[in-house]
């Protein structure tokens, strides 16, 4: 599911891992993750990276996996084509303009990745790879007429043609590739699918995102093995009732279309676990959808619901729920039945009172309430003992809500106020959030920070941009894990003298501050220049202190009175004080008689 946001906002990266991203949400796909891990293990276990062209002795007849990606290759090296036992070949992200005839030697190759190269034509010999199961030609400016070669690859199970400029799919591909299970066609210019697509009876996944479909391709509804359909970012106005025939469908992505309603028959897709309806024009859901009891992820953001659909509260298996920008004013009492929720996005709504129903969701780990009208938090928020990320940016909080300090698992807090009320202080009790790693408190009216920040050992990111800070507490130098300190647009004129002790600090921003120490020209040179300036300052100060102590000792030993008296006398223009014998002390060395 895709959500965007400006500024610091609390949103989800991948569902089950439950980590935050800014500003985009991505799907969590355990299958893809497993494939990635498997690929990496193979890479580590069997062969160093391919080229290896410089060390050809490392390539042997028994080599079956090779990675030549990101090498700047313009052709496929003959050394690779000579490896007849190769099963998996990665040549993506190069500058390869043509496939040589020798490609036909790779008769045992099952996986061939050539995406993001400069291929236009495909040589006929490519069609001779009789063992090939997975082919990726994405991101190449392919000539459509050359794709007929692909139809000869009868063993193909996965074919990816993303971003290849396709305006149509060659019918030969759909007629001949009867074993195809995954068909990737996203980011092209397709308006329809050939009717021969019905021959793909083994197809499990089809990706058609970012094309020009105005009508749902109904032929998909007879492909009964389909588990994943991705039609995000098209121009669909409706979904046919025949969608109910896809009883094995598990993931259905139709975000960013022009849908106004859903068919009742969608309820027959009883295995559906992910339903993304984000950014459509849906006002209500058919009551029959309450039968979709296996749903774990639902996206309704960007629709004008105004109320939480009653049936939604029956989806008790939900882990992730996106209700961003849906014109909500509150939640139903039955919302507390969603006890398995881990992520809840209620941002950009019209919520004035924190929904207490949320406090019953004890498994909740991420809560986004950004850009609402919430004024205070209830004490019962302490029941959210597993909450790790809380987004409250852009609300009408009258003061920093101390109820937050009861959230013992909190790791990231977003409470910047780019709109709504501004906070004037950050309580010393912030130290109670011992697990806090990131604190975003930008766009407020803070004039100072609490010294207790130095007692937060896990703090890594502190965003205080656009406040009224005049100085930083010296204690901040003890937050040894701090990686980012964002201070631009404040009233700072100096930095703590030991700030360079923050050895993990990689990002320090000081723009739009009236800096004097270090001066602006030093600040503009970056961290190293700032650290050097602070160290030199300490050395100068230490030397001045040493000289002062030495001179004070001399004055006292010579009997000229205390150092302070001497300073006072000089400031008033008087003569130096007399020594103990009543004689006036000389300006230079003391007389021998005065020596003790």
From Swiss-Prot:
Chain ranges of the IQ domain: 540-569
Protein name listed in UniProt: Leucine-rich repeat and IQ domain-containing protein 4
Domain of life: Eukaryota
Keyword Isomerase: no
One Pfam family here: LRR_8
UniProt entry tagged with the keyword Protein biosynthesis: no
Keywords (A to Z) from UniProt: Leucine-rich repeat, Repeat
Extent of the LRR repeats: 22-44, 59-83, 84-106, 108-129, 130-152, 153-176, 177-200, 202-223, 224-246, 248-269, 270-293, 295-315, 317-337, 338-361, 362-384, 385-407, 410-433, 434-457, 459-479, 480-502, 504-525, 527-549
Region span, Disordered: 569-596
Biased segments, Basic residues type: 569-587
